[in-house]
């Protein structure tokens, strides 16, 4: 009997939730507010699944609900959903206000962090006027060549015709691309085994090269 490898990476657990509960956990685009007490439903539904633990589920759920994408969906008129995507009541104003406050605080922290990491311009000092006797011109040593900048990875969206079995690709899952290998291509469905061991089924527009 084969033992099931337990998922420990939060991104891999989120990918598993996107695949298992696609009407509740949205991988891309606008999300939906989750039902209050959803963690308990999730723990019960996955009680017999040895891939994930309650602790890791809680961490993944916290990551999902604290993302800017999720906090932006908590707004007036939005309906909470259960694991099957069924409406479970409209949001209360108190919860909307709390989500917007969290979003603003998170965005302000990110802005402050970017500002702190930005290079500060050196203060300009007024040059002192000093009489310097003229000297014969001497050759200046050549300036060293500037160091090459580190390469920047620019992903491009794959076309179905570009994809083959055993090809290494990156799958768009939320904010962070996850690396994996194509195991099968069935018409428009592409099966990808992630480096974490999880196999998911996606379309070509979700694959980056």
From Swiss-Prot:
Residues 105-148 are annotated as: Disordered. Disulfide bonds: none annotated. It holds the Pfam family ProQ_C. The keyword Nuclease does not apply. It is found in: Cytoplasm. GO terms for molecular function: RNA strand annealing activity; RNA strand-exchange activity. One of its GO terms (cellular component) is cytosol. Keywords: Chaperone, Cytoplasm, RNA-binding. It comes from the Bacteria. SMART domains: ProQ (SM00945). GO terms for biological process: post-transcriptional regulation of gene expression. Belongs to the ProQ family. PANTHER family: RNA CHAPERONE PROQ (PTHR38106:SF1). HAMAP family: ProQ. RNA chaperone with significant RNA binding, RNA strand exchange and RNA duplexing activities. This is RNA chaperone ProQ. It comes from Shewanella baltica (strain OS223). The gene is proQ.
């Amino acid at each position: 009997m084969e033992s099931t490898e337990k998922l420990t990476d939060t991104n891999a657990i989120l990918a598993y939730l996107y695949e298992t509960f696609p009407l509740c956990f949205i991988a891309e685009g606008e999300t939906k507010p989750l039902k209050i007490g959803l963690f308990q439903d999730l723990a019960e539904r996955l009680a017999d699944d040895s891939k994930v633990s309650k602790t890791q589920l809680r961490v993944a759920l916290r990551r999902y609900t604290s993302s800017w994408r999720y906090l932006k969906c908590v707004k007036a008129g939005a309906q909470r959903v259960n694991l099957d995507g069924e409406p479970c009541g409209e949001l209360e104003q108190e919860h909307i206000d709390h989500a917007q406050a969290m979003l603003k605080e998170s965005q302000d922290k990110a802005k402050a962090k970017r500002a702190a990491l930005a290079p500060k311009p050196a203060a300009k000092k007024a040059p002192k006027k000093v009489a310097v006797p003229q000297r014969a011109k001497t050759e200046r040593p050549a300036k060293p060549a500037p160091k090459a900048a580190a390469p920047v990875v620019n992903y491009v969206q794959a076309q179905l015709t570009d994809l083959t079995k055993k090809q290494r690709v990156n799958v768009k899952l939320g904010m962070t691309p996850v690396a994996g290998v194509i195991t099968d291509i069935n018409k428009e469905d592409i099966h990808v085994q992630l480096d974490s061991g999880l196999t998911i089924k996606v379309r070509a527009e979700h694959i980056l090269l």
